[in-house]
Amino acid sequence: MSDRPKAIDIMYYVATPEFIAKWTDAKKGELICRMERAIGSLPQFESIPTMLTKMDEAGVEKVFITQTKMWSYWNKWMYMDTQLEEVLQYTEKYPDRFVGLAGYNPFRIKESLAEIERAVTKHGFKGVYVHIYGFDIPLHDKKMYPLYAKCVELDVPVSVQAGHVLESMPSEHGRPIYLDYIAADFPALRLLGAHTGWPWVEELISVCYKWDNVWFGVDAWMPKYLKPEIINYINSRMGMDRAVWGTNGLPWKESLDQVDGLGLRPEARQKLIRDNARELFKL
């Protein structure tokens, strides 16, 4: 669509062949669940310029690259252990196109907080991304509170996967209602519940309605499959300021084309795919 604003994707991964090969090898010996087998591997690009070309073709201005830390629920090791340098290869060479989100390991709190502070203050990262499930603690566990306090200090948001998890680990610890505790205990912390919160969509919507500091992530789903409750929310007076768009590696052009087909008001679409991300992450 020619009048579509340049989009900002708030959820992506390191997508180099080297990283994907490392991730594929790490999953050997892990239990792979039915959905993960059906969907397949994360996307990869032969080079970052190739990725930029695809972004340009789709009308995507910026992509957030997450330093994802994923703990194995079964084998108790960091089987997705994205290094800061793997994100920096995007953000330092192409700072106008890529935004970094640091990772957090609640089992290595001191080291994690030091790396987060370095990522934000030295390298310009704009927040932190958390994949909680394999750690087998809920989002409002006290091991998470040092992270939330640090992000208040640094004035950056925390993005957390909320809802079910694709990988072979229980989903309960990512329930969106746990953001209710965090928002109450850290009213100055900007929180993003990513991945729509499904199957607890209404929980995430309720928390976003209640708190000024919680945002709704419309990512990891092709928009044509979004529940009507989500579409109604992001098209509503109170919801249109709280929702941000991302892909989690799904194809940009198809996703944005499907956003165009949701019947959103023009201002709601503009805020969803661009303006709200700029506000949330202070771009």
What are these regions (language model features)?
Residues 13-15, 68, 133, 196-197, ...:
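Flexible loop residues that form catalytic
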